Amino acid sequence: MKIDLNTIFPSSCKEYIPGKIYKNIKIGMRKVSFNNDTESILIYDTGGPHSDQDIQTNINNGIKKLRVNWITDRQDVEYYDRHTINTNSSTAFPLQNNKALKSKNDKPVTQMFYAKNNIITPEMEYVAIRENSLIQKLLSHTPNTIIPEITPELVRQEVAAGRAIIPANINHPESEPMIIGKNFLVKINANIGNSAVSSDINNEVYKMIYAIIYGADTVMDLSTGSHIHNTREWIIRNSPVPIGTVPIYQALNKVNGIVGELNFNIFKETLIEQAEQGVDYFTIHAGVLKKYIQYTTNRLTGIVSRGGAIIAQWCSIHNKENFLYTNFEEICDIMKSYDIAFSLGDGLRPGSIADANDKAQFLELKTLGELTDIAWKHDCQVMIEGPGHVPMHLIKENVEKQMYFCKEAPFYTLGPLTTDIAPGYDHITSAIGAAMIGWYGTSMLCYVTPKEHLGLPNLNDVKNGVITYKIAAHAADLAKGNPSAYIRDYALSYARFNFRWYDQFNLSLDPETAKSFHDESLPSEHAKSAHFCSMCGPKFCSMKLTHQLQLNSTE
């Protein structure tokens, strides 16, 4: 499948900004040139080499291992033979490495460990430069404004305090560092993955590429069908963004879907297997305690988290406490050896408006706060997953409780959906909640596609989900006063008022769609310089009338 970058992002090219502390690092941005050829702006870009027109990528080869030297130069890791590698299968990634990296002497190799020890890593400088992508442009428009710059030292402080994470497994050197935290740009995640009904590795890889080109900051592989290991290997080797998983899915697959046969040893084996591949963050449902399950029985929709339901059933079958909870410190030992971030799962999240903000949900959240403290003692990076289905008036309470219980660890929410009545449009019902919860302080938003509750998303659904959530995240950034967000709105509005149609299209989140809508009624090239559109026509265009008014006032 060929992706035409000239069609997706016209008048754009990749530009690389060098580091100042680490001179050898180069941060890729998307440069959008204006039609007058004298101005341009740099936009945060998540596509890696896939969005660079000068690089020919081939999914059979994977992408450049950007961070190998950064990782090995710290001299705190060593190579060893991977426990699980699958090279004989017809679906195996052709260039698998039979070696993996791990920390030496069981010492932490996490970004949090370095941050606590006052070390600014290349990853920290990288994300600081990315976050500042549009600030210089804003300064040129408002020279007397004092704008706080995001510095590598600020990044270090936020990571050390646990208010931000940089998911960056040492076995995923292809990843371009990014940061998740309430004092940075709101990020979005795209879920992909096969199912028992539909399994195609190439299709999942292209879903990942499609998602990141359009702006997904991380991707979760939630595969539950065939070839889970190999699907993940292909995705990671081609991904410049952090990859997350829910390891309990593969652990259950290993026991043929029989929940009662799950145990911690199988789960631990799965964690190490995925750690060696390079997974950057794990969803771990360690907060689903046996005593909380009783509070879900009177819910309208019960337990809707797949991981939460698996753990609840296991506890019920064995009449034992959640083995993820009882073995949590051993899990921390694995995480800190590879720098895998925790995404503490909300296994008891509400699956309907009727169940929002109930006792089960908030009991689990409190436990996640306690687990966060334990993980931090091991220097593990942590973010907290959140709901779900929540009406607008109850959204703020979720953020307030999460900030209190979890001491401002980054919040990562699925929407939330603000109503249950719109199957087929749940990307919209959830984007309403996502924009609000992002404004209140959530750090990352998990996208919802139009197929939510209905089926497995295809490429077009992935695009629609990503664009919808880029809108929600950007709206939240504007509301929070993030200076990097403002300049793009300013530039597009300026182009709109001056009837610079191509600049309007090219500055938008989806230039191809914007231009196609304009072409439906005014397809000619002449119309691309017209001082009206088909909505108002030449006589009723308010902006054209305003231009005339301004002209008259100066005469």
UniProtKB/Swiss-Prot annotation:
Documented EC number(s): 4.1.99.17
Record bears the keyword Transferase: no
Pfam families: ThiC-associated (PF13667), ThiC_Rad_SAM (PF01964)
Reactions it catalyzes: 5-amino-1-(5-phospho-beta-D-ribosyl)imidazole + S-adenosyl-L-methionine = 4-amino-2-methyl-5-(phosphooxymethyl)pyrimidine + CO + 5'-deoxyadenosine + formate + L-methionine + 3 H(+)
Alphabetical GO biological process terms: thiamine biosynthetic process; thiamine diphosphate biosynthetic process
InterPro entries given in the database record: ThiC, ThiC-associated_dom, ThiC/Bza_core_dom, ThiC/BzaA/B
Cofactor(s) in the UniProt record: [4Fe-4S] cluster
Positions annotated to bind Zn(2+): 389, 453
GO cellular component term of the entry, any: cytosol
Family: Belongs to the ThiC family.
PANTHER family linked to this entry: PHOSPHOMETHYLPYRIMIDINE SYNTHASE, CHLOROPLASTIC (PTHR30557:SF1), THIAMINE BIOSYNTHESIS PROTEIN THIC (PTHR30557)
Function per UniProt: Catalyzes the synthesis of the hydroxymethylpyrimidine phosphate (HMP-P) moiety of thiamine from aminoimidazole ribotide (AIR) in a radical S-adenosyl-L-methionine (SAM)-dependent reaction.
Name of the protein described by the UniProt record: Phosphomethylpyrimidine synthase
